[in-house]
């Protein structure tokens, strides 16, 4: 197949995912991201779908991001590319028996790359805006969506693995300007 045929097939898959998500009112990241991509396309907003690894569970700490388990978007607005995760913005998984709970989080729209990189690691190196390595990503603590809305930044430690000295652990927080 030619490159044009491959791109056409990929485009058809994205459209099919978007339509299915809209019709069923259900979806996972592929469907959400495809639907957002299609909406952007219809509005004339340049958009991309970015596959990669996510960090959303405690078991992800220390694990290298080798498997693609998530997809999100980049959109070009106001003369720059912005990161968007419509799936994580829509809600969270809760409970012993995993269930999706709608809980809108606007922090996943046009998220600064430095914050986005705490939980998202693009497969394509060209899409990693911070230059973070796979090992650095793996060693990060687990950041929840509420952290993105907080008015502070964790200055130290920058890894999830803490080694206490004399039974003390020092945490430094920077409170951000309002």
PLM features: what roles do these ranges have?
Residues 15, 66-68, 166-168:
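Short, solvent-exposed coil/turn segments
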């Amino acid at each position: 197949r030619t490159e044009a045929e491959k791109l056409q097939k990929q485009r058809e898959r994205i459209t099919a995912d978007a339509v299915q998500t809209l019709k069923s009112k259900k979806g996972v990241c592929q469907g959400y991201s495809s639907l957002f991509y299609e909406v952007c396309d219809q509005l004339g907003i340049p958009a991309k779908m970015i596959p990669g690894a996510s960090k959303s569970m405690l078991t992800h700490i220390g694990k290298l991001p080798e498997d693609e388990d998530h997809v999100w978007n980049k959109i070009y607005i106001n003369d720059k590319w912005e990161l968007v995760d419509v799936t994580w913005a829509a809600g969270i998984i809760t409970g012993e028996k995993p269930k999706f709970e709608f809980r809108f989080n606007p922090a996943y729209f046009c998220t600064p790359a430095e914050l986005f990189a705490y939980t998202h690691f693009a497969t394509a190196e060209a899409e990693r805006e911070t230059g973070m390595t796979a090992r650095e990503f793996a060693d990060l603590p687990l950041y929840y969506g509420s952290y993105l809305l907080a008015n502070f930044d964790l200055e130290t430690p920058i890894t999830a693995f803490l080694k206490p000295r004399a039974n003390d652990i020092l945490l430094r927080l920077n409170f951000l300007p309002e």
